[in-house]
Amino acid sequence: MPPAQPGMRIGLFGGSFNPPHEGHLLVAETARRRLGLDKVWWMVTPGNPLKDHGKLRPIGERLAAVRALAPGPHSVPTAFEARHRIRYSADTVALLRRRHPGVHFVWIMGADSLASFHRWQDWQEIATSLPIAVVDRPGSTLSVLSAVTPQVLSRFRLPETAARALPLRRPPAWVFLHGPRSTVSSTLLRRQNGD
């Protein structure tokens, strides 16, 4: 698990990253800049329980690809979920809050992930445990904002102009961020590579 000091603002950006691409980098960097985060932990997951693992590359390969895509002092690629045998994001959040009680964690996700967030194991536990930053992705804006999770959490949504305050907000709290977008997707890249 990466080190963290009390008072730090750390974004948690989990995904299969199969493969990672510029769209992921834009989500992470938009959140980091707009929220004033000290670090973004790129949590390379052993596998998304809601996705087919048939074409999932080995975790070491995906972790190396994230390191190559997101070098620099603010990006921290990690596969600690695999080492701790964690399957669900809610368990990741619970572990991090126990290990680092003074750290201000923020869950980061692309808008495309928000559309299915209500299908995640214990999603409401995640939403009430830490603030959430949702970064716009092409083709997601209108459909995502009418999805289950944004409707259930609508009264806890911060205006985009208050994004920098999100890491210190008591959950549930979330913000929808707009910024540069990329049409690249992992599915498209796998298709182009014949996977």
Where are these regions (language model features)?
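Nucleotidyltransferase catalytic core that binds NTPs
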Residues: 1-195
